[in-house]
Amino acid sequence: MRRQVIIWVVIIIASLILGVIPNISTNADTHDLKLNIESLAIPESHVTTSTGERGAAIARLNNEQYLLGGGKGGFALYLYDSKSNDERRLGQIASAGARLDDSRFAITDIGVLSKKGNRANVVVSYPRYDRVRKCVSLILGSYQINFGAKSAVKRNGTWFTSNPCVPVGAVQHAAGRIEVIDRKNVYLTLGDLGFSKINDEQARGDLGSLFKVSKSKVLKISQGHRNQQGIVLIGSDLYTSEHGPRGGDELNLITKGGDYGWPAVTYGEPYSAGDYVKPTATGSHEVFTKPLKYWVPSVAPTELVVLPEVEAWGEWSSQIVMGTLREEALIFIELIDRTTVGQVVSADVGERIRDLEISDSGQIIATTDSGKLLIISSSRRLP
């Protein structure tokens, strides 16, 4: 496989946000930051269809090994070794009949519950197409993986199936981000799936919500979400990133019982008069839980990770990094405290970032929609 090393000097625009009230940021300072970006081709796990392409889902194991999810059929798991840049196919998480030939029908996230020797227990989320009812639901399945010479993926059961099953529309709004709490519990995001009745609280059912899920129990934590493509747990605080319409992308601190406003309010704007839903109020979040930070215009946020406490990351140690699609950048987010955002810094990487992880050695690992894996490190501290 092709291995390419790129050293990029990234000019970072730092935006200083003052106060607790969410605000559109303005440029306050400019810092030079050298990011070392190593680019590796991962063609086996790259999702490619007649309708487009999508980067692989990624989850860290150990010893610089990862699980990748995707492939040509969207539903395959791979063992990836970043030292050798080797992808080994392990098996399928669902049948080909559970998807359409569409890059959106692919593994959305992987959560590693436990690993011992050549075996691991994981949960995997994906949108499933029902060919009889011609509708789509988000699934969270439980699997045991064997990494040995006879690799295998065994399904143990289904932890979650979203209801209602809705007509195929904005499948990209499935969300499906997983944050592992412990060996038996995870948080799971569910978007609105482009459901035309999303403004009807009874009809929308599970859609637009965040759940705590185990093998035997599903608990709704919050609602009013559009498409939460990033999630990270910092201590007991849960943060998500969320797509708004034509702007209004959000960073949220999740509170139990919170309503985050969609589709009633957004800081973004409707796409057109014929869109599947029209918000009641734009440019506002009155009455509902406000985001910690929002972006206008849109950056199209994806996964969230927390940088480790290592000297190489300097003042950014223990802070949040967010991937983006439209912006093709990593966004560094300073938390002054659990509810207050400080500097927000955008670092251009020139790729649509689908998923993020942190390596054993503290580097940022990113998968891209072009079928690459980026290993990103800081070569010097910010002043």
Segments from the language model and where they lie:
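N-terminal Sec-pathway targeting helices
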Residues: 1-12
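Beta-propeller domain segments
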Residues: 27-32, 67, 105-107, 137, ...
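Blade-edge beta-strand/turn elements of extracellular beta-propeller
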Residues: 30-49, 84-101, 145-168, 202-230, ...
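Beta-strand-rich domains and repeat architectures in extracellular enzymes and scaffolds
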Residues: 43-75, 299-306
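Hydrophobic core register within WD40 beta-propeller blades
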Residues: 56-58, 110, 178, 228-231, ...
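Residue-level detector of Asp-centered blade-edge/turn motifs that repeat once per structural unit
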Residues: 60-63, 113-118, 180-183, 233-236, ...
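Residue-level signature of beta-propeller blades and closely related beta-rich strand-turn architectures
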Residues: 72-73, 128-130, 192-194, 244, ...
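Blade-level signature of beta-propeller repeat domains, shared across WD40, Kelch, NHL, RCC1
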Residues: 357-383
